């Protein structure tokens, strides 16, 4: 189960990827989430990955893959 903030970022990732065919940058995630630091986004992504919703590839930019659908998500 995702927290409210994690779910907000999850939905943003899904919509952004669908509209742009690429995942957003950290800066775009920061702006959407109104978070000032990269570490705030990093922590959200870390726990989303730990919970099994996304997979990240640290050596590549924008390399986030949604691997698990969120329950009750209509995006």
What residues fall within each predicted segment?
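Pre-recognition alpha-helix immediately N-terminal to the DNA-recognition helix
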Residues: 8-15
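Residues within the DNA-recognition helix of helix-turn-helix
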Residues: 44
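Basic amphipathic alpha-helical segments that dock to polyanions
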Residues: 47-48
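Short, cationic-aromatic polyanion-contact patches
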Residues: 3-6, 20, 25, 57-75
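Glycine-centered, phosphate/nucleic-acid-interacting loop/turn motifs that mediate DNA/RNA or nucleotide
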Residues: 52
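Helix-turn-helix DNA-binding helix
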Residues: 40-41
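The alpha-helix within a helix-turn-helix
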Residues: 30
């Amino acid at each position: 189960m995702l927290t409210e903030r994690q779910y907000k970022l999850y939905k943003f990732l899904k919509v952004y990827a669908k509209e742009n065919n690429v995942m957003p940058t950290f800066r775009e995630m920061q702006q959407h989430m109104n978070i000032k630091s990269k570490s705030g986004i990093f922590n959200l992504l870390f726990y989303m990955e730990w919970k099994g919703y996304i997979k990240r590839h640290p050596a590549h930019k924008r390399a986030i893959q949604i691997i698990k659908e969120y329950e009750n998500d209509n995006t």
